[in-house]
Regions:
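Short, charged, amphipathic alpha-helical segments
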Residues: 8, 34-45, 93-96, 121-129
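Preference for long, well-ordered alpha-helical segments
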Residues: 98-149
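Conserved alpha-helical segments that form or flank metal/cofactor-binding pockets of metalloenzymes
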Residues: 35-70, 138-144
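Long, non-catalytic architectural segments outside compact domain cores
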Residues: 23, 42-45, 81
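Alpha-helical bundle segments that constitute or directly flank the non-heme di-iron/ferroxidase center
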Residues: 1-31, 89-114
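Carboxylate-rich helix-loop segments that flank metal/cofactor sites and access channels
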Residues: 56-89, 97, 101
Length: 149
């Protein structure tokens, strides 16, 4: 396995998550819900740190980090863009689903690439923990602002 190729694949997953959260941001502006917008911006910042840290490791390996999505990533973003969000709750549910998909993908990536250096494994473990925290943030938002549960 070429470490940088695998890390670029992982980085493209992060780019996909960032692209999907941009869609949520655009859609959330329609609802004039400042708490929702604030939450999405906060999560985008988390994704940005993931992008920066992963890019740094790829560059340290002497390779160029990708700025693009995989074909599957492009299709995933396109599919998300086609969704109609009628209320903030719809964005919350979609964000929980996509974050869960990212969490599962990161866990699978870590399992499939067990020979990665410890520094890289730690980065991916941190991403996994952040995805768990993001899910918790969404649940807290739903409980505090939507009032459904």
């Amino acid at each position: 396995m070429e470490k940088s190729n695998e890390l670029n694949k992982f980085l493209s997953y992060i780019h996909m998550g960032m692209s999907i959260y941009r869609i949520y941001y655009e859609q959330s502006e329609r609802f004039n819900d400042n708490e929702l917008i604030k939450l999405i911006v906060e999560i985008e910042e988390i994704f940005k740190t993931h992008e920066e840290k992963t890019t740094r490791i790829i560059n340290e390996l002497g390779e160029t980090a990708t700025n693009s999505l995989t074909a599957a990533g492009i299709m995933g973003v396109y599919k998300e863009r086609l969704k109609i969000f009628e209320e903030p709750f719809d964005i919350c549910i979609s964000a929980l689903k996509s974050t869960n998909m990212g969490l599962i993908s990161a866990i699978k990536f870590l399992n499939d690439n067990q020979e990665l250096p410890d520094k890289t494994k730690t980065l991916i473990q941190d991403v996994i923990k952040d995805y768990q925290n993001i899910q918790e943030k969404w649940l807290n938002y739903i409980f505090m602002n939507i009032g459904c549960c």
